[in-house]
Structure formats: structure tokens, C-alpha cells
């Protein structure tokens, strides 16, 4: 109770800000106002446990980083191995995408490519054709070993994702 009181007092003073139950951050001041923490920090407990990845940011936030869209979103999608109910984290709404493959640091970039193909129609502010071209550009930059791994990971995805990946790989040679 004493710790809770102290934290509540610091939040009231404005020294720290609360993200979620038991999660706080110290806001940085700039000439443009208060900076919020990076998205990965807001959901860090959902992405890592004991230094091992248990989830990864996917959806619009990740697709913007990959250059597939220019939209910035307040909805975070996290790929995890088990189903979880959607939740709110500060001003973000967090939803979960069940990922049948093992989540490792090496797999995450490949899983993002497959998720982009899976969620092709849901990527905002861009056409599916542009997305396919963007994903093809990402796939073209992969090494031979990564291409084999990508094909293995695709086995657990829907048939249309495997078909689209096959068509892209065919077009790349």
C-alpha cells in the first residue's frame, strides 16, 4: 500500500505517467511537448519473458516499419503462440494474432513477411498490388537459407498465403 500511494503521488505530480496496472514511465519533455514511450516498451511484458521472445509486434505498426504503409496506428497487434483476449494499454488497443510457428528472434522478420501476406487486405492506405510488390522486395533481399526457412514457416499458414508466397517466389526466380 505504501508503494502504491507513493506511485500515485508521483503520477499526480506529473513526475511519472501510468501506462497500465503496475507499469509506469518517466515522460521526456521536448519543445513539442511530452514524449510517449516507444510502442515496444508499452507492451514489453507481452513480447518477452526471461529474455526470450514470446510475442512480436505485427499488424499496421510493423507494416509501417517495413515500408508497406505510411499509416500510424493506435492499435497494436501482437503475434503470440496462444490466444489472448484484446486489451487496452494506455491509449493503445492491443489485439493478438495466434501464431502457430515457434517465435524466435531469427523467425520474427520472416513471420512479419508471412503476416503481411496473411493480412494483405487489411493493410491501410495502400493497394494489395503495392503490398505484394513491397513484400516481393523484402523477399528478394533474403538469403537462400532464409528463403528455405520462410517456405517451412509458411506451411502453418492458410492456403492463400502459401499460394501467394509461391507466386512471389516463382516471379523472383
Residues of each region from the PLM?
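Short gly/ser-rich loop at a beta-strand->alpha-helix junction or flexible surface loop bordering the NTP-binding
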Residues: 20-23, 51-90
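Generic structural signal for hydrophobic core residues of well-folded globular domains
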Residues: 46, 50, 66, 116-120
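A short, charged helix-loop
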Residues: 88-90, 94-98
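Amphipathic alpha-helical interface surfaces
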Residues: 3, 58-59, 109
Amino acid at each position: 500500500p505504501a508503494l502504491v500511494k507513493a506511485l500515485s503521488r508521483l503520477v499526480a505530480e506529473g513526475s511519472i505517467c501510468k501506462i497500465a496496472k503496475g507499469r509506469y514511465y518517466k515522460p521526456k519533455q521536448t519543445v513539442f511537448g511530452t514524449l510517449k514511450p516507444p510502442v515496444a516498451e508499452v507492451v514489453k511484458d507481452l513480447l518477452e519473458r526471461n529474455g526470450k521472445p514470446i510475442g512480436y509486434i505485427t499488424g499496421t505498426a510493423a507494416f509501417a516499419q517495413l515500408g508497406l504503409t505510411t499509416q500510424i496506428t493506435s492499435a497494436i497487434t501482437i503475434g503470440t503462440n496462444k490466444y489472448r483476449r484484446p486489451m487496452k494499454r494506455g491509449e493503445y488497443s492491443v489485439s493478438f494474432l495466434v501464431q502457430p510457428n515457434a517465435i524466435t528472434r531469427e523467425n520474427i522478420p520472416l513471420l512479419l513477411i508471412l503476416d503481411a501476406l496473411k493480412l494483405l487486405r487489411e493493410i491501410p492506405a495502400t493497394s494489395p498490388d503495392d503490398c505484394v510488390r513491397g513484400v516481393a522486395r523484402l523477399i528478394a533481399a533474403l538469403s537462400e537459407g532464409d528463403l528455405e526457412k520462410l517456405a517451412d514457416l509458411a506451411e502453418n499458414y492458410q492456403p492463400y498465403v502459401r499460394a501467394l508466397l509461391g507466386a512471389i517466389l516463382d516471379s523472383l526466380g
